[in-house]
């Protein structure tokens, strides 16, 4: 009865679809798990199915008025709350603003425009401060009829327990490489795509379907991945002068990412991925290596990395992510990290 195009997460999908069929849709949901596991994709399919009026047939039908409005981002009863750009800095604000939650509360209290559910989705729920969290808690504690709020976060520990307790928590897990491979092979419209590339992307995704799909849809992203890994090996063998030169190359390579730190975090993802593979090779677990296209380089350079050094670099990357969230200059963050490689 459903038409959801999702890779993996079968238990979560069954749970949500059952809630729709049995008229047990909750007021609050928390989708939690690392990026690229399909949290936002599942949320969209869930919302689309709740709103769909194209009966009989699978939901969402994609053709009824509600489906068309939602697909085009025009449904008046669906609200997306995201961090906004700070006019002074030109960068995303550190937190979701209290005024945004107050505005959401006002909208949810109004009558529905299309005699449907009123739905709010907050894709970066980890960016609540104390005031916004308290304001949202009041909405969750006193939900209006036929209202659904979906929070999405990479880590439930970043949310107040009071918020978590008011939501049905659904934990998204990594997806098997074979399942991702099969999903990619079933996609249409990608010329020159074959089984060997699907296998490579499935391995590179490390259980994250969204990462594999992004590589497939965006060739530039794949080129950046290749550049990031090559730069990593280059940096580990370079002197300080060469390292600073490479920093400039990385900044130039990611020059379009000065406002959105997402791509710099992708750089860190790629470095963590190769470090994980070095650990696997050093531990004689070669079949588990994700970056199979860099296996020769991994094997050649593995002795440059002790287990302690790998752990130290991983800790440094996590610290760098924290600095980026605090809006510290990207170049300074990279310099601090790379000097200690």
PLM features per residue range, with description:
Residues 1-131, 300:
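Clamp-loader machinery-focused feature within the broader ASCE/P-loop NTPase space
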Residues 128-129, 143, 158-159:
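Catalytic P-loop NTPase motifs of RecA-like helicase/translocase cores
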């Amino acid at each position: 009865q459903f038409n959801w195009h999702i890779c993996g997460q079968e238990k979560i999908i069954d749970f949500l679809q059952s809630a729709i069929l049995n008229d047990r849709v909750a007021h609050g949901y928390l989708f939690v798990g690392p990026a690229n596991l399909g949290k936002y994709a599942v949320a969209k399919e869930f919302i689309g199915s709740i709103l769909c009026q194209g009966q009989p047939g699978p939901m969402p039908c994609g053709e009824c008025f509600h489906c068309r409005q939602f697909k085009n981002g025009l449904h008046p009863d669906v609200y997306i709350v995201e961090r906004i750009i700070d006019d002074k800095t030109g960068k995303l604000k550190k937190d979701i603003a209290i005024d945004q939650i107050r505005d959401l509360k006002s909208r949810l209290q109004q009558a529905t425009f299309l005699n449907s559910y009123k739905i709010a989705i907050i894709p970066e729920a980890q960016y609540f401060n104390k005031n916004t969290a308290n304001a949202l808690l009041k909405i969750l504690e006193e939900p209006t009829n036929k209202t659904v709020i979906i929070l999405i976060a990479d880590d439930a520990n970043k949310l107040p327990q009071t918020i978590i307790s008011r939501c049905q928590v659904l934990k998204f897990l990594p997806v098997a490489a074979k399942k991702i491979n099969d999903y990619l092979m079933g996609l249409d419209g990608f010329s020159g795509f074959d089984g060997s590339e699907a296998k490579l992307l499935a391995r590179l995704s490390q259980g994250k379907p969204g990462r594999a799909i992004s590589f497939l849809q965006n060739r530039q992203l794949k080129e950046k991945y290749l550049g990031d890994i090559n730069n990593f090996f280059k940096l580990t063998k370079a002197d300080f002068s060469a390292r600073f030169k490479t920093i400039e190359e990385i900044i130039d390579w990611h020059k379009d990412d000065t406002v959105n730190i997402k791509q710099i975090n992708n750089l860190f993802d790629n470095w963590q991925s190769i470090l994980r593979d070095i650990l696997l090779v050093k531990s004689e677990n070669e079949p588990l290596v994700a970056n199979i296209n860099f296996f020769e380089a991994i094997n050649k350079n593995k002795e440059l990395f002790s287990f302690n050094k790998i752990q130290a670099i991983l800790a440094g990357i996590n610290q760098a992510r924290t600095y980026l969230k605090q809006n510290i200059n990207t170049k300074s963050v990279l310099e601090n990290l790379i000097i200690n490689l």
